[in-house]
Each structure stands twice: as structure tokens, then as C-alpha cells.
Amino acid sequence: GNAVRSLLRQSLAIGKLVLHVNATRRPPRLPKDPRLVVHLSEKNYADNGKFAHMSGTRGYVLTADDDIDYPHDYVERMVGEVNHHGRKAIVGVHGATLPYGPPVSRWSQYTSMRRSHVFTVEHGGRTPVDIIGTGTMAFHSDLGLPSIADMDTLRMVDLHVAVWALRQGVRMHMIPRARNWMTEFEAPSEDRIWQQTK
């Protein structure tokens, strides 16, 4: 509920917050707010669930994770960065660049050879990246919308979106920010999607 609260208390108010829950029970301590729409699911889509209810969405789209404390100006900054790129790019706070050369074909190559731009670290520019972390991502629907139907594996949603963007010819960029502009909430490590991929 803390990430949801941080997104509902933004300097630039959001119109709607769609929460996909990989369970049949509503999470405890969610705030009561008419902008919050909760979708429960018997099927566990893992992090792909961020895209389960996106069809038909118009306007600015920001995807989020439940373990991040979003700063008060997060939505305002992200929308500003989308506009800086003329609504023609995906922007994010966490991302990675892949090496040039032969294609990366194994998970071990991906984890060892990529150059990560971690969301808690200061970043001075609008660096182009190959992959954006979908917990810190924004774009405009004019680019189109990634479809959950095209995501054939779980816990790899960042890679699915990167492939979608590459096929659409959509660029991805990091945003400039100060150190610890965003932080993580404490959570048991085994509950994290990233830990489940190891």
C-alpha cells in the first residue's frame, strides 16, 4: 500500500491508478481513493500484470512496482521527460545498456555483460538505453501499447518491453536525477521478482 500512497500524493495528480494483483484477495491497507482501480487475478502474471489492463489506455502511461517509494514530483518529472522527447521515447529511472557485438543469448550473459543504470544512483544525462525497468517507466500512448499477449515468459517484463520498443522503433532514455531521488521500501528479498529470476 505504501507505493500506491506515494503515487496518489503527487504534485501532478494522476487521473487513474490501475493496480493488478496476482491474487484473489484485495491487499490490506490500500487507501480508499476513487482513482484507484484494483484488478484481482486467479492467474499469477508476475510483473507482466502491469500490462494486463492497459488496452485502450490514452495519454501518459507510467508503470510502477510495489516496492518503490516514488518521490512527490515523480509523475511531474516523468511527464516532463516524455514531453522533452516529443512523446516519441520511453523514459525511465532504471535501465541497462547491452554490449555491442554478438547477440546476448543466455541469461548469464545478460546479467554479467549489461551496464546497469540503477534508480537510486545519481544520473546526469538522458542516456540512451536498450532496456528500461518497468517499475520506473513512462511514455505516451501515441507510441502504442505493449500487449501482455506478446509476453510469453514471466519475470522478464523489462525484456519484453525492450523487444516491443525495438520492433516499433521506439527509443529509450534514462532521466537525469539526484542520488536517492527514488528509494526502495524494505521487503523480504525472496518476495522480489528480480530475486525469483536467479
Place the predicted regions along the sequence by residue.
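Catalytic phosphate/metal-binding cores of nucleic-acid and nucleotide-processing enzymes, i.e., regions
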Residues: 1-3, 24, 52, 82-85, ...
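C-terminal catalytic/acceptor-binding lobe
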Residues: 141, 146-198
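Short beta-strand-to-loop acidic/aromatic patch adjacent to the donor-nucleotide binding site
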Residues: 58-69
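Residues at the starts of beta-strands that form the adenosine-phosphate
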Residues: 15-16, 60, 171
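Short, charged/polar "capping" segments at the starts of alpha-helices
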Residues: 1, 24-29, 100-101
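Short, acidic, metal-binding catalytic loop of nucleotide-sugar glycosyltransferases
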Residues: 2-15
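Active-site-proximal specificity loops/subdomain of glycosyltransferases
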Residues: 18-59
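Conserved catalytic core of nucleotide-sugar-dependent glycosyltransferases
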Residues: 69-149
